[in-house]
């Protein structure tokens, strides 16, 4: 369970719902995920009220407008960013996003929790890394640049560059 302070006194942000086995490109699966996560929210509030001191009267103020899907499709670009590029803190000649630093946040595909292989502990970056422009140029489409989570990268690399600060960095670089 992740609890983050909110701007208003007495409020916190909770990040805890999880659903697996969905296809993020399927409307039916996304609907099922919405239902599962909303049911989880009710149970989470009940748990907080019963077991966490200070949360006896807690309630949901708001929630995301739709379920967040961690990963779906990736384009094939001129270069595929790998976890080894990140671990080695590679600085590419054609970088468009640099000074990126985040942990590997691989969630299990089999159930709640982090990756059962412990990738988040095995892969430690030597420092800040860059993302090459080539990751943003699709192999088979003209007139399109990729930005954010859909750039070309391995599953493990994606667990690192998918976070908002790095996606914003990529977007700024591609759009400039």
Please give the residue ranges for each predicted region.
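Flavin (FAD/FMN)-binding glycine-rich loop and adjacent Rossmann-like elements that form
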Residues: 1-176
């Amino acid at each position: 369970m992740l609890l983050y302070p909110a701007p208003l006194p007495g409020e916190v942000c909770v990040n805890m719902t999880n659903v697996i086995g969905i296809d993020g490109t399927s409307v039916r699966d996304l609907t099922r995920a919405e239902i599962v996560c909303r049911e989880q929210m009710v149970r989470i509030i009940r748990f907080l009220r019963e077991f966490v001191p200070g949360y006896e009267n807690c309630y949901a103020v708001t929630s995301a407008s739709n379920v967040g899907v961690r990963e779906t499709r990736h384009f094939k670009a001129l270069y595929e960013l790998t976890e080894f590029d990140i671990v080695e803190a590679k600085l590419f000649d054609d970088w468009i996003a640099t000074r990126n630093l985040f942990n590997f946040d691989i969630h299990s595909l089999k159930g709640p929790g982090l990756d059962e292989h412990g990738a988040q502990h095995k892969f430690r970056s030597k420092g800040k890394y860059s993302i090459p422009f080539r990751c943003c140029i699709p192999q088979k489409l003209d007139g399109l640049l990729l930005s954010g989570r859909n750039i070309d990268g391995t599953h493990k690399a994606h667990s690192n560059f998918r976070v908002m600060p790095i996606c914003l960095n990529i977007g700024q670089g591609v759009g400039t």
